[in-house]
Swiss-Prot record:
The keyword Hydrolase does not apply. It comes from Prochlorococcus marinus (strain AS9601). It is found in: Cytoplasm. Can catalyze the hydrolysis of ATP in the presence of single-stranded DNA, the ATP-dependent uptake of single-stranded DNA by duplex DNA, and the ATP-dependent hybridization of homologous single-stranded DNAs. It interacts with LexA causing its activation and leading to its autocatalytic cleavage. Transmembrane segments: none annotated. This is Protein RecA. One of its GO terms (biological process) is DNA recombination. ATP binds at G73, P74, E75, S76, S77, G78, K79, T80. Keywords: ATP-binding, Cytoplasm, DNA damage, DNA recombination, DNA repair, DNA-binding, Nucleotide-binding, SOS response. Coiled coil: none annotated.
Amino acid sequence: MSLEEKKKTESKEKDKALSLVLGQIERNFGRGSIMRLGDASRMKVETISTGALTLDLALGGGYPKGRVVEVYGPESSGKTTLTLHAIAEVQKNGGVAAFVDAEHALDPVYAASLGVDVENLLVSQPDTGEMALEIVDQLIRSSAVDLVVVDSVAALTPRAEIEGEMGDHVIGSQARLMSQAMRKITGNIGKSGCTVIFLNQLRLKIGVTYGNPETTTGGNALKFYASVRLDIRRIQTLKRGTEEYGIRAKVKVAKNKVAPPFRIAEFDILFGKGISTTGCLLDLAEETNIIIRRGAWYSYEGENIGQGRDNTIIWLDQNLEIRNKVESMVKEKLTEGTEVSSNSMKALNSNPANTIAVNDIKTVA
């Protein structure tokens, strides 16, 4: 037998042994317990829209289904608003969403104004961190819930801390709780297809001279288990004269296992109304040269449609036929591969200020 024939025989034997062991594993542990990475049907990740077109682009489609997502940032930066929009999107598509309100601060009126069906929203206000995470785990295992939001990790107080006295040192109890919960949750989350979004607060590390002193609460487990981590910041207050009517938010995709990370998205959050979808559309239409800005004036197909960004947004909202036409043109250009700031890393590389400065952030308790 020649050397080439010997290699072919060995290769056939290996293929046969591999198919046998794969079949045995699937019989023992179920279909999908082991797979080839090139299996296209398994590689495709379904997503949930964030409610902001620019952020959907930065994430590669939206929040991935069957994954853990962490959203963190300073106070009043738009974390809860972001998740309420995700809940509204899930409900629009006939899905079921749950909100685990560990902070006991959910405003049903505000949620309804963002499009959330509060009548059918599952809400839990747990007494302890253990109770909250057990509820999350049971909702995931039911396979009947599409999205679970936990607001927030910082408010998941361990039972030992609640039952103890003020001033008692229970070092690392919350980190241990989160570590145990993540090990338990991630085993079930992929099978159920449920997305879990954890909101988190920022703290400052004591004595850090070099590097970023910011850190999130609850230890490091969530950082490792999360497929997507979003850093949301308030970069501007929107005003009409002296009246404040919203904020400009910047979201950096700090981690993404299902699409390229480190992309940046910006959008407006209007008080009482949530994310300005028309504002996102105008930004993208300007970047793709569908709407042209010259000075303060915006024009569409050679005709001026508004002086200033706010007036142009109002005009688009009043002329829905043209707005829908602009939206379809923007989506067509993006499908063709047109690069904009939300799906590019150029903005990040050219602007070191995107590692947003620390200001007005809660210090370590």
